[in-house]
A protein has these predicted regions:
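Phosphate/dinucleotide-binding and metal-coordinating scaffold of catalytic cores
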Residues: 1-238
């Protein structure tokens, strides 16, 4: 048995990726029509051809057995923590969810142009109201209870909140907690940024501050870390 996913670019099928049961290196092959398109999505490493691409020499912890073209679409630390929380709510262990399934979980919500089908996990056909304070609190809980997620999210009333943060937080990339939102500057209303929002809304990448367990490789971020990042952003705008 294998896990198979279709890879799409701008609504067009460009190929498929598969991972055989018991193996840890995936195989990718371009769609026959796309192989003749002349659109090079990875010209240096995966030029258009009818060959099957596999990259067993790539770092397994980094690429999870995927070609670099596809691995770049995988969720990072925070996104994976959210997926693990969702798996716990489904009674599954994180290691039962392979790399191709994680691509399918990203589906069409990724930051780049690539999309993966069939989509897995909670999705929304219309925008829903989001309470940022609840997202921050839930992000802290996810990062603080990584070793006991199933018990943490078994409590009554957390399913909807978990679904909300899964819809906005798994695709943004990066190690630290963040979400893709739609914000209305006039009403200050925040909605999911994963689907088309109503008129008056703007799309933003929202970085959470004050989240417990929020870090990359070093110590946990102190409160106000986001303000420091913002200060660096302002400094970068200064022309000397």
């Amino acid at each position: 048995m294998s896990t198979l996913a279709e890879v799409r670019l701008w609504g067009r099928t460009i190929g498929a990726v598969s991972l055989q049961e018991g193996e840890d290196v995936a195989a990718f092959e371009y769609d026959a029509a796309f192989a003749q398109s002349g659109i090079q999505v990875a010209p240096m490493v995966m030029p258009l051809s009818r060959r099957v691409y596999r990259f067993p020499a790539l770092s397994r912890p980094t690429f999870l057995g995927l070609p670099g073209l596809l691995a770049d679409s995988l969720p990072d630390k925070f996104g994976n923590a959210l997926i693990d929380a969702w798996l716990a709510s489904q009674g599954r262990q994180p290691d039962s969810f392979n790399a191709v399934e994680r691509l399918c979980y990203t589906g069409g919500r990724g930051m780049g142009a690539l999309e993966f089908a069939p989509a897995i996990g909670p999705s929304a056909k219309q925008t829903t109201h989001i309470e940022v304070s609840k997202l921050v609190a839930l992000a802290s809980e996810v990062l603080s209870h990584r070793n006991n997620l199933q018990a943490s999210f078994a409590a009554e009333g957390k399913e909807d909140a978990l679904t909300d943060i899964l819809r906005v937080g798994t695709s943004a990339g990066g190690a630290r907690a963040k979400a893709v939102i739609a914000w209305n500057p006039k009403t200050n209303e925040v909605r999911s940024g994963q689907v088309k929002a109503d008129k008056g809304f703007e799309y933003w990448l929202l970085k959470f501050d004050g989240v417990s367990g929020n870090k990359d490789k070093e110590l946990e971020d102190p409160k106000g870390y986001g303000v420091i990042e913002y200060a660096y952003y302002l400094l970068s705008l200064i022309h000397i």
